[in-house]
Every structure is written in structure tokens, then in C-alpha cells.
Amino acid sequence: AVAKLLAAADVTAALEGCKADDSFNHKVFFQKTGLAKKSNEELEAIFKILDQDKSGFIEDEELELFLQNFSAGARTLTKTETETFLKAGDSDGDGKIGVDEFQKLVKA
């Protein structure tokens, strides 16, 4: 799981900060969890966990379940949050986020 690569207290704090629907902000989440400080290699390992169907991309269905990769009991992202997250990360406009796009998004 992703949580093994991050400090538990940081993950808990980040999840607490986005419990309410439409309160998820990927930049804040990446900062609070410590993801923003990870190396590209570590981010690639995390990407592979998030890419649940192993397609080489994170699609909207996987983004919707994003928080559950950090804690099984976390909520799903709303449609608005998922669309905003996808738009922020999908720099080539193909409707999904590749590993390079994910690394850039986390470090942005």
C-alpha cells in the first residue's frame, strides 16, 4: 500500500483535511502526506499502486478511489474533485494520467 512509503501521521492529517465532499485539493494533499518531497523513483512506485488495472495510466475511475489507496476507510472523490484532479494532471489531454504526468503533478 501507499501508506508504507509515507509517515502514518502525515497521511492521517492529510485525510482529515479532506473528509468533507469537495474539500480535496491535490496540492495540499501532496504536501501534507510528504508525496511532494519524494523522488521520481518513489513516485513511480506509488503510481504503480494507484494504477489498479495496470494499464500504465491512472484513469478517472482510479482517481475516484485515490484516497482509499492511503486508507481503506477513506471516502471516494466526488465527480467534481475527480474531474479537477484529472484536468490538473492530464497535460497531454488524453483523458488519463501517465507516470511522467503524475510525477510533474505531485511536484508542481
UniProtKB/Swiss-Prot annotation:
A Pfam family it matches: EF-hand_7
A GO term, aspect molecular function: calcium ion binding
Residues noted as binding Ca(2+) 1 in the record, renumbered to the chain: D51, D53, S55, F57, E59, E62
Miscellaneous notes: This is the predominant parvalbumin in latimeria muscle. This parvalbumin has an isoelectric point of 4.52.
Keyword Oxidoreductase set for record: no
Keyword Cytoplasm (UniProt): no
SUPFAM superfamilies: EF-hand
Protein name: Parvalbumin beta
Keywords recorded for this protein, A-Z: Acetylation, Calcium, Metal-binding, Muscle protein, Repeat
Cellular component aspect of the GO annotation: cytoplasm
Organism: Latimeria chalumnae (Coelacanth)
Residue stretches making up the EF-hand domain: 38-73, 77-108
UniProt: Ca(2+) 2 binding residues: D90, D92, D94, K96, E101
Family: Belongs to the parvalbumin family.
Residues of the signal peptide: none
Record's function text: In muscle, parvalbumin is thought to be involved in relaxation after contraction. It binds two calcium ions.
Residue list for modification N-acetylalanine: A1
Domain of life: Eukaryota
Source species taxonomy: Eukaryota, Metazoa, Chordata, Craniata, Vertebrata
